[in-house]
């Protein structure tokens, strides 16, 4: 029986952000530091950085050539101090150990690889007291319990590749649903769990109602050249 009353919140990051929790960081991953400039000379022991679980619609086997290292350095430009608990990267997400351990207590069907991350400045100085993990998703399970085609959604504006924003999810009929799940790099959680996440004071994001997320990204999509003040003003609405 479908849980008609199941509602969700979704992760929203600041538009402008703060110096200690920026929404975008010019950065490089490297497994080792073998030069004075690892930002421009990263070291990889295999091809893990180029792994994608799907290519041309076909699954790519996770061979040894694509396996994550146990640890790598995250070389960040123009960041003197890093306090964020969440950062979205093109290859996965970076989570603080505090957030990762907190999320582990909740039911989740997604599959992922994980390794430790040490953030450093371009001068190779530590920029955070927090411990971080890099999460690379192998399989996202949301299609198992959400019918995206029949969900209440709107097409995003000004996008070359068609994508959608969801006002509500059409749940498939099953007996149980996860407490949290990931849609690409975006965390979605049941209302009660999202409220617990917000109540823990994590930095760099907030869990918001789906409608609020749609409203915010519709505004951002229709304002491609915002001023800093416009961005900060929107952030004050949520953070």
Q: What is the role of each PLM region?
A:
Residues 83-145:
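Extracellular-facing segments of soluble proteins and assemblies that are Gly/Ser/Thr-biased and enriched
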Residues 58-90:
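A glycine-rich, hydrophobic loop/mini-helix early in the fold
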Residues 74-80, 96, 168-172:
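Short amphipathic alpha-helical segments, especially helix-boundary/capping motifs
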Residues 57, 66-71, 107, 152, ...:
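Short, flexible coil/linker elements and helix-boundary hinge sites characteristic
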Residues 1-61:
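N-terminal ordered "arm"
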Residues 4-5, 118-239:
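Acidic, proline/glycine-rich low-complexity IDRs
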Residues 15, 20-24, 39, 62, ...:
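Generic low-complexity segments that are intrinsically disordered, proline-rich and/or Lys/Arg-biased
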């Amino acid at each position: 029986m479908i849980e008609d009353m199941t509602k969700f919140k979704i992760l929203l990051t600041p538009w402008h952000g703060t110096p200690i929790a920026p929404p975008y960081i010019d950065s490089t991953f490297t497994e080792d530091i073998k030069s004075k400039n690892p930002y421009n000379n990263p070291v990889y022991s295999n091809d893990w950085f180029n792994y994608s679980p799907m290519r041309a619609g076909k699954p790519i086997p996770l061979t040894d050539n694509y396996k994550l290292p146990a640890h790598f350095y995250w070389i960040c430009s123009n960041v003197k101090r890093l306090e964020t608990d969440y950062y979205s990267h093109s290859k996965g997400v970076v989570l603080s150990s505090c957030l990762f351990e907190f999320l582990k207590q909740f039911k989740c069907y997604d599959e992922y690889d994980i390794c430790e991350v040490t953030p450093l400045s371009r001068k190779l100085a530590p920029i955070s007291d927090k411990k971080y993990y890099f999460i690379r998703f192998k399989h996202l399970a949301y299609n198992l319990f959400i019918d995206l085609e029949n969900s209440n959604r709107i097409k995003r504006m000004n996008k070359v590749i068609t994508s959608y924003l969801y006002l509500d999810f059409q749940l498939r009929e099953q007996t149980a649903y996860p407490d949290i799940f990931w849609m690409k790099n975006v965390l979605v959680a049941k209302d009660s769990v999202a409220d617990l996440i917000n109540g823990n004071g994590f930095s760099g994001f907030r869990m918001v109602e789906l409608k609020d997320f749609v409203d915010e990204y519709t505004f951002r999509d229709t304002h491609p050249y915002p001023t800093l003040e416009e961005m900060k003003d929107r952030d004050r609405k949520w953070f």
